Amino acid sequence: HWSFGKQFLSVEQAYKRGQMGLAYELVINSNPCIAYLMEENTLMMQVLVIAHACYGHNSFFKGNYLFRTWTDAESIVDYLVFARKYIAQCEERHGVHAVEQLLDACHALQNYGVDRYKRPSPISAEEEAKRQDEREAYLQTQVNMLWRTIPEPPAGVAPLPGSLHSDDDPLGLHTGGRYPSEPQENLLYFIEKNAPLLAPWQREIVRIVRKLAQYFYPQRQTQVMNEGWACFWHYTLMNRLYDEGKVDEGLMLEFLQSHAAVINQPGFDSPYYSGLNPYALGFAIFMDIKRICDAPTAEDREWFPDIAGSPWRETLEFAMRNFKDESFIQQFLSPKVIRDLKLFLIVDDDQVEMLEVAAIHDDRGYKRIREALSSQYALSVREPNIQVVEAAIRGDRSLTLHHIQDSRRPLGRSVYPVIRHLQQLWGFPVHLVSMEDGKVTRRYHWPVEEESKGAG
């Protein structure tokens, strides 16, 4: 897909301009882990990437609870091969343009193709391929059942013999009530199972994008931890190699220059500031956990009585295995790291003319900064909460979704391109209603209705 080429060119240009301290590396969470290293890397960079990716990222993939729950390292490579072959076959049969348009729409919604509260049952790629034909035929019969129009008998009139029985209406579509009966947060799954106009091959591609989005779901919640863990171990391993005399001073100087560039955190008033560097934040917290275990201060014993003075390896492994970014920061961000990174809290209220410095470096401020920073890494804050609430199967077949607005934050400018892609997949009008505290704040439609064009 063209989006991957766009991403590759962006990384390539940044690398050529020297804007990446760590060499570009590719690591696949498979079993065994597969890592790709650039041929033009220096010896130091090859050693660094091996320590960072093959040891750091690999151990995080194998240990963290989110990856253990949501990913199946045994079968991902086989499934990627299956997906590539299937999409190539679709391009040959239906044309590149048709497949690309479908992938555009699926990629726009891929963050809404995740079951956040269910654990998928992993199956092998062979079983996936074996089930494909059966799934295509079954899904099409289910969709035909969903959208079949059968007149309901008048009230008080018994159905004719041989008419629709409960066995012929497994979804309960002709018994009244709203469909779906409960809001659905997995938009791609709902599209795959219920879109009335999609062909079987299109449903399979929606499924492929949905399964890959599910596979990458843990990475979206653990970037700070994952990169911090990898940086901690490449720093630890490289220093151990030097201490044991296996590398010389020249290689270490080259390493330290690269490492410093990776974990650099520009100040808020720097022209290069673009937010918190996840490498810097994660590395600082993991290094601080080790310090608290090895040489705790009185402040550390007050804030972290459970880990102060404990064995650092066990504590680090516990932190790596049992947290995601949000809970990791809430649990382990210390006052020292807050001071070192010079963190403070600004409140920018759209209903107040002035900015407020809401937290500084005191006991109360440390807690507020930690709470505010951890909440920024919660998916519920970073991504809009959008759910399917109704498909008008007896009316115009339109699809209605609700967006639960938080803290008066409206949807961004990309809302119309996204619902256009959703309408392309669904095939009928799409209505998106933003709500906060039970009140409607705005309505979006595609195709665009006249009253929404002038809405503010």
Regions of interest found by a model, annotated:
Residues 40, 44, 60, 246-456:
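Non-catalytic terminal regions of proteins
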Residues 32-49, 216-225:
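Short pre-active-site segment immediately N-terminal to the catalytic Zn-binding motif
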Residues 52:
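TRNA-recognition modules of translation machinery and tRNA-sensing kinases, especially anticodon-binding
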Residues 30-32, 55, 195, 213, ...:
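Short, flexible loop/turn elements at secondary-structure junctions
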Residues 1-33, 67, 156-198, 442-444:
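Auxiliary, metal-adjacent structural segments of Zn-dependent hydrolase domains
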Residues 173-274, 278, 283:
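Long, internal scaffold/assembly segments composed of regular secondary structure
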Residues 1-14, 106, 112-142, 146-168:
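Low-complexity, highly charged intrinsically disordered N-terminal segments
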Residues 58-127, 230-246, 257-269:
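Post-HExxH zinc-binding segment in Zn-dependent metallohydrolases
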